Curated annotation (Swiss-Prot):
Assembly behavior: May form a homodimer. Component of the pid-1 variant of the PETISCO complex (also called the pid-3, erh-2, tofu-6, and ife-3 small RNA complex) containing at least pid-1, tofu-6, ife-3, pid-3, and erh-2, which is required for the biogenesis of a class of 21 nucleotide PIWI-interacting RNAs (piRNAs) that possess a uracil residue at the 5'-end (also called 21U-RNAs). Within the complex interacts with pid-1.
The protein's name: Enhancer of rudimentary homolog 2
Swiss-Prot/TrEMBL GO biological process terms: 21U-RNA metabolic process; cell division; chromosome segregation; embryo development ending in birth or egg hatching; piRNA processing; positive regulation of cell division; positive regulation of chromosome segregation
Tissue expr: Expressed in the germline (at protein level).
Record organism: Caenorhabditis elegans
Record-linked Gene3D superfamilies: Enhancer of rudimentary
GO cellular component, one term: RNA cap binding complex
Main location (coarse class): cytoplasm
Outcome of gene disruption: RNAi-mediated knockdown results in chromosome segregation and cell division defects in early embryos. RNAi-mediated knockdown results in defective activity of the PIWI-interacting RNA (piRNA) silencing pathway. RNAi-mediated knockdown disrupts the localization of tofu-6 to the perinuclear region of the germline. RNAi-mediated knockdown results in larger tofu-6- and pid-3-expressing foci. RNAi-mediated knockdown results in decreased expression of tost-1 in the germline and in embryos.
Protein encoded by which gene: erh-2
Keywords: Cell cycle, Cell division, Chromosome partition, Cytoplasm, Nucleus, RNA-mediated gene silencing
A matching Pfam family: ER
InterPro entries per record: EHR_sf, ERH
Covalent S-S links between cysteines: none
Keyword Cytoplasm in record: yes
Length: 113
């Protein structure tokens, strides 16, 4: 499946049904970026200083969501394929590893607002 496939990100932030929301993206990468941006916005509300985080903190954030999934368009079948929280976490890890490798082996991101 191509990372440039149309992707719908589905999120439920709390047990309340009215906390459900979704986003429409041109690619899996765009949807993952939006999810990480949501996490960064969450962190920036806690601190005015630049924020450093690693993948384990993103995982914790994702685990606290009542539900998170993606529907990714498969051009070969003409259907959307559902992806779970576990799959999303693996994709976040791969994305962060590719963008932010450090000599110590950890993946860290610094965000300044």
């Amino acid at each position: 499946m191509s990372t440039s496939s149309h992707t719908v990100l589905l999120i439920q932030t709390s047990p309340r049904l009215d906390s459900r929301t979704w986003g429409d993206y041109e690619s899996v990468t765009d949807a993952l970026d939006a999810l990480c941006k949501m996490f960064e916005d969450f962190l920036s509300k806690k601190s005015a200083a630049p924020v450093t985080y690693d993948v384990s903190q993103v995982y914790e954030f994702l685990d606290k969501l009542s539900d998170v999934s993606m529907m990714i368009f498969n051009r070969e079948t003409g259907q959307y394929i559902g992806r779970t929280r576990a799959w999303i976490k693996q994709q976040v890890y791969e994305m962060m590893r590719g963008r932010c490798q450090h000599p110590e082996g950890g993946e860290k991101v610094i965000v300044g607002y």
